[in-house]
């Protein structure tokens, strides 16, 4: 029964993707084939190798001018850039799109794409980017209050005029993008708000908020719980089941008492708000849209971290309340990449990483996130400040990923995967076809000078199986061995060639043998080197009579 239900849901999702594609006047949309999502523009798949600008860098055209060529030199193909409500609408109903136009012009000049980040009602929980005419009129645009009755510069999600003002401004932005960019398609996605989340309480506690909280859970959410009982994510399902799996009732009767229920309530209303903004914008120009989340830190309670944002433990709530959003995205300032990526790829959610702490390990994580999670894209934060080793490493990783992206996007593979290894997790195994691969950090060999260091740089690799016995290995700092699943066969390296890929064509550079593959024992890319190697295998009998 569960398998049948999953088939029905997958069929529904596939049909939904087709409907989105057919109804999308922008010609830019997300499709999913099997477990691999793709961003398409004019039916051409596109992988975002991006970087997000620092918060203030897009507020001046003069400041921006040298940034775009710098980022182009780092092999980026996409820039994630804020659009500031306070600058775009300095007076009510009077819009200034000069910064937007300037960014589009710069991106086109360097053949780059843009993802705009709408710094609207909320940015990192706060309402700091709202126009001054809103900030100074708290009666018309109400704020949240804390447990002491003190107001904060966080607009209430229940402010109807706040929502209408945001929708009007966002719609104006999307209309302007359609009028100026629908042909050239420089802008390919839009983020709605930025890191929505409630501070310093788990939910709003105003009279208006309390009246909603004391009312019944909306039928839309109750219907979703009942129809999807068997496949609800465990975090939400547990709260509902423990409270008796009721089919209606107040928030506390359905989900129990406590901060967790407060967060579910607030998430519902945040998601509804974001959905209205996104839906209004899509009516003008139907680009893919997403929201991003500030991830909670261990041991913190809702309200101590930004509560009720698009977090994985309340993903069900966000997805049912905000169908106009194409995905929910994590912002990474947390080292546990695998843990959070696993959570964000549940429920059919396509992974896109709009922010990651800018550090040298980003270069390895790019291979892992694109290869293992089939991410739509990857984007370290404050990218214009990359320099030294960080710049060099990320530039080389992006160059390699860009060269193999044609193979990935055109689906010219049997399978592919990505791995991330460091000193803590020095070796991993995966199966590809008839072979078991052991992927280790290059320092595990003990040959390199850095192998004795207490900290090893992260290494990353993408492995693409092109045919039964042919593989591409693209990355940095790894050692790979191959073993046949059939114990009666011994697998050996037939040839290992360093190649480059240009205009989709594989170009031979160097035959790697002898010391470079340890006399045929393994494939190796040294730490500090970035390569694409083409590997051909052959099998021989394990025993010879």
What are these regions, as identified by a protein language model?
Residues 63-138, 270-284:
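Aromatic-lined substrate-binding rim segments of carbohydrate-active enzymes
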Residues 140-315:
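Polysaccharide-binding and catalytic clefts of secreted carbohydrate-active enzymes
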Residues 367-487:
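Aromatic- and carboxylate-lined catalytic core of secreted/periplasmic carbohydrate-active enzymes
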Residues 448-456, 470-545:
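C-terminal beta-sandwich/jelly-roll accessory domains of carbohydrate-active enzymes
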């Amino acid at each position: 029964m569960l398998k049948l239900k999953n088939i029905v849901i997958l069929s529904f999702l596939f049909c939904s993707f087709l409907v989105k594609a057919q109804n999308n006047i922008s010609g830019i949309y997300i499709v999913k084939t099997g477990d691999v999502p793709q961003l398409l523009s004019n039916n051409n798949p596109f992988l975002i190798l991006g970087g997000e600008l620092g918060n203030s860098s897009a507020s001046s055209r003069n400041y921006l001018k040298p940034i775009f060529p710098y980022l182009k030199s780092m092999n980026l193909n996409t820039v994630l850039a804020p659009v500031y409500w306070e600058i775009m609408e300095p007076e009510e109903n009077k819009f200034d799109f000069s910064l937007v136009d300037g960014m589009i012009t710069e991106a086109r000049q360097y053949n780059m794409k843009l993802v705009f980040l709408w710094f609207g009602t909320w940015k990192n929980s706060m309402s700091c980017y709202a126009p001054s005419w809103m900030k100074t009129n708290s009666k018309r645009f109400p704020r949240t209050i804390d447990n002491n009755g003190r107001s904060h510069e966080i607009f209430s999600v229940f402010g109807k005029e706040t929502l209408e003002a945001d929708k009007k401004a966002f719609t104006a932005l999307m209309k302007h993008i359609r009028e100026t960019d629908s042909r050239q398609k420089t802008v390919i996605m839009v983020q709605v708000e930025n890191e929505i989340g409630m501070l310093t309480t788990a939910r709003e506690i105003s009279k208006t908020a309390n009246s909603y909280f004391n009312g019944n859970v909306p039928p839309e959410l109750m219907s979703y719980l009942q129809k999807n009982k068997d496949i609800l994510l465990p975090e939400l399902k547990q709260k509902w089941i423990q409270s008796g799996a009721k089919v209606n009732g107040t928030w506390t009767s359905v989900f129990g008492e406590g901060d967790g229920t407060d967060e579910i309530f607030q998430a519902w209303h945040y998601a509804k708000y974001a959905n209205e903004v996104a839906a209004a914008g899509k009516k003008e120009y139907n680009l893919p849209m997403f929201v991003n989340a500030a991830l909670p830190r261990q041991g913190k309670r809702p309200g101590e971290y930004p509560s009720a944002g698009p977090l994985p433990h309340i993903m069900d709530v966000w997805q049912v309340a905000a169908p106009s959003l194409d995905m929910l995205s994590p912002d990474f300032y947390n080292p546990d990449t695998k843990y959070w990526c696993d959570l964000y790829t549940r429920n059919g959610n396509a992974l896109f990483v709009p922010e990651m702490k800018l550090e040298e390990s980003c270069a390895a994580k790019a291979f892992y996130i694109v290869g293992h999670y089939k991410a739509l894209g990857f984007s370290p934060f404050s990218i214009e400040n990359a320099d030294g080793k960080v710049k060099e490493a990320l530039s080389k990783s992006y160059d390699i990923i860009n060269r193999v992206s044609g193979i990935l996007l055109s689906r010219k593979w049997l399978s592919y995967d990505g791995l991330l290894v460091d000193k803590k997790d020095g070796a991993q195994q995966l199966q590809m076809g008839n072979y078991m691969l052991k992927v280790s950090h290059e320092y595990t060999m003990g040959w390199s000078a850095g192998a004795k260091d207490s900290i090893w740089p992260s290494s990353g690799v993408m492995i693409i199986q092109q045919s039964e016995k042919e593989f591409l290995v693209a990355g940095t700092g790894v050692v790979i061995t191959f073993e046949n699943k059939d114990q009666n066969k011994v697998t050996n390296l037939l040839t290992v060639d360093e190649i480059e890929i240009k205009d989709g064509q594989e170009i031979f550079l160097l035959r790697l043998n002898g010391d470079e593959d340890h006399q045929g024992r393994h494939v190796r890319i040294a730490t500090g080197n970035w390569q694409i190697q083409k590997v051909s295998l052959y099998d021989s009998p394990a025993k010879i009579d």
